[in-house]
Structures are given as C-alpha cells and as structure tokens.
UniProtKB/Swiss-Prot annotation:
The keyword Zinc-finger does not apply. Keywords: Autocatalytic cleavage, Cytoplasm, Decarboxylase, Lyase, Pantothenate biosynthesis, Pyruvate, Schiff base, Zymogen. GO terms for molecular function: aspartate 1-decarboxylase activity. Heterooctamer of four alpha and four beta subunits. Belongs to the PanD family. It is an enzyme of class 4 (lyase). The lineage of its organism: Bacteria, Bacillati, Bacillota, Bacillota incertae sedis, Caldicellulosiruptorales. Its cofactor is pyruvate. One of its GO terms (cellular component) is cytosol. The modification Pyruvic acid (Ser) is found at S25. It comes from Caldicellulosiruptor saccharolyticus (strain ATCC 43494 / DSM 8903 / Tp8T 6331). Its main location: cytoplasm. The active site is at S25 (schiff-base intermediate with substrate), Y58 (proton donor). This is Aspartate 1-decarboxylase.
Length: 128
C-alpha cells in the first residue's frame, strides 16, 4: 500500500507577481526550490492564506536569490501581489518508507528569504 504524504513545503511565501498571459504554472526562486527539495515541473498545491483558494499547478525555476513567487496563467486570477501562500509538494511512500520520512519545511520572511528550515511542524507553531 502507498500513502500520499507531505514531501516539502514553503510556508507563508509572499506573491511577488501574477502573470495572467503566461501559459501556466508557478515560478519559484531556485534557492527556495532547492531548500524545499521541489523540482522543476513538479506538481504542487498552492494555498492562498489571504482568500482561502487552493489549487494545483507545476513549478518553473525562477532566478536564484530573487525571492520570486509568480503565479502564471489562470492561477494568476486566484492571487494578488502581496498575498501569502503555502506551496506544498507530496510524495507516495510505502509504509516502510513512511517510518523514516522527514518532510522539508522552509519558512520564509516577507521578502521570501529563508529564515528557518525544519523537518517537522509543532501544533500551534506560528511564524507570522
């Protein structure tokens, strides 16, 4: 049996751009992608903290160190520049793999610079 679990997460990133006329996807700063273990073209779920929207898209690599979080195509209608989002990737694991799995969680500041890396979240933890 396989179970789907959190692989990685970029927590409370700030949307820097929304480009409606692009084909689709989310552009993420390469540094954030590497820290979270998110791959180019990987499917991700995006949750908009400001309005509650949840949607899936795929990742395009953005300029390293730029802080870019850009929603492209139709997804651009679901965010506004300045919104806070959570970007999550998932993986399928066997029960044996699950026992040792540690997700990568990247906490960022308002400029999308890394402030904390973790492998777990505590209940009620808030880095607001």
């Amino acid at each position: 049996m396989l179970i789907e679990v959190l692989k990685s997460k970029i927590h409370r990133a700030t949307v820097t751009e929304a480009n409606l006329n692009y084909v689709g996807s989310i552009t993420i700063d390469e540094e954030l992608m590497e820290a979270a273990g998110i791959l180019e073209n990987e499917k991700v779920q995006v949750v908009n903290i400001n309005n509650g929207e949840r949607f899936e898209t795929y990742v395009i690599k953005g300029e390293r160190g730029s802080g870019t979080i850009c929603l492209n195509g139709a997804a651009a209608r679901l965010v506004q520049v300045g919104d806070k989002v959570i970007i999550m990737a998932y993986c399928l694991l066997t029960m044996e793999e699950y026992k040792t799995h540690m997700p990568k969680i990247v906490f960022v500041d308002d400029n999308n610079k890394i402030v904390k890396l973790s492998n777990k979240e505590e209940h009620s933890e808030c880095l607001c």
